[in-house]
């Protein structure tokens, strides 16, 4: 997946129970792997959808005293005005676009692919969807933020995904990525894409994690946008 890091293992995959006619690519958070999310999607799967949960390359993370861990890009700080790893974010987005291209080669059109992620992975999924020329079905962005927000226009984006459907979810007790980040992100997203297609759901008492209700909302979003076609 990552041309610059051949040691990254192959993604965790929940294969479709029959011929795959759609796919979900979901990116884990900092320090995690794709395995836990693959298990979560196995619990809400639909038989015609393939779920792909790639693993981030291991790299030193400034926020964590340069300790090496799975990370899509470097995180320097968690405050709204922290410096961002612009080149790392852009390279990571290119790697995800290559993964989407691979699925298109495998026979799944890009408009039958939903991109998503949790925390750092959710941030990367939003950035990738808003900058790619591949028309996607939607984005499911959990407990996250929009990286490099100043790089986006004041008005709507051009390109393939100006009408993309976005489900953004956040816990109202998140101590790591505060709910305010989610609220600011959703307001920005509504200026970049058709605001009628942006949904923001919050979960009472949820911290920086997921919950059963959220996963059911994610399933409903996926199944609505990626219905069976045969």
Curated annotation (Swiss-Prot):
The modification N6-acetyllysine is found at residue 224. Optimum pH is 7.4 for the thioesterase activity. Gene3D superfamilies: alpha/beta hydrolase. It comes from the Eukaryota. It catalyses: S-hexadecanoyl-L-cysteinyl-[protein] + H2O = L-cysteinyl-[protein] + hexadecanoate + H(+); 1-hexadecanoyl-sn-glycero-3-phosphocholine + H2O = sn-glycerol 3-phosphocholine + hexadecanoate + H(+); a 1-(9Z-octadecenoyl)-2-acyl-sn-glycero-3-phosphocholine + H2O = a 2-acyl-sn-glycero-3-phosphocholine + (9Z)-octadecenoate + H(+). InterPro entries: AB_hydrolase_fold, LYPA1-2/EST-like, PLipase/COase/thioEstase. GO terms for biological process: fatty acid metabolic process; fatty acid transport; negative regulation of aggrephagy; negative regulation of Golgi to plasma membrane protein transport; protein depalmitoylation. Keywords: Acetylation, Cell membrane, Cytoplasm, Endoplasmic reticulum, Fatty acid metabolism, Hydrolase, Lipid metabolism, Membrane, Nucleus. Platelets. Changing residue 119 to A: Loss of thioesterase and lysophospholipase activity. It holds the Pfam family Abhydrolase_2. The active site is at 119 (charge relay system), 174 (charge relay system), 208 (charge relay system). Its EC number is 3.1.2.-, 3.1.2.22. Homodimer. Belongs to the AB hydrolase superfamily. AB hydrolase 2 family. This is Acyl-protein thioesterase 1. It comes from Homo sapiens.
């Amino acid at each position: 997946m990552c041309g610059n890091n051949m040691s990254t293992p192959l993604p965790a995959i929940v294969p479709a129970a029959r011929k795959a006619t759609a796919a979900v690519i979901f990116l884990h958070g900092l320090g995690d792997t794709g395995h836990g999310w693959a298990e979560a999607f196995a619990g809400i799967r639909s038989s015609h959808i393939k779920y792909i949960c790639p693993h981030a390359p291991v790299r030193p993370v400034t926020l964590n005293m340069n300790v090496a861990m799975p990370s899509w890009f470097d995180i320097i700080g968690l405050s709204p005005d922290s410096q961002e790893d612009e080149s790392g974010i852009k390279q990571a987005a290119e790697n995800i676009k290559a993964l989407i291209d691979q699925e298109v080669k495998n026979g799944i059109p890009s408009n039958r692919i939903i991109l998503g992620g949790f925390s750092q992975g959710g941030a990367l999924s939003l950035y990738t969807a808003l900058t790619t020329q591949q028309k996607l079905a939607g984005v499911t962005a959990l407990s996250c933020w929009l990286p490099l927000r100043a790089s986006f226009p004041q008005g709507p984006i051009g390109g393939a995904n100006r009408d993309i459907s976005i489900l953004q979810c956040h816990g109202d007790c998140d101590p790591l990525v505060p709910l305010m980040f989610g609220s600011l992100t959703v307001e920005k997203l509504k200026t970049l894409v058709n605001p009628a297609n942006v949904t923001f759901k919050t979960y009472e008492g949820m911290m920086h994690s997921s919950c059963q209700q959220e996963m059911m909302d994610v399933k409903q979003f996926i199944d609505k946008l990626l219905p069976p076609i045969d």
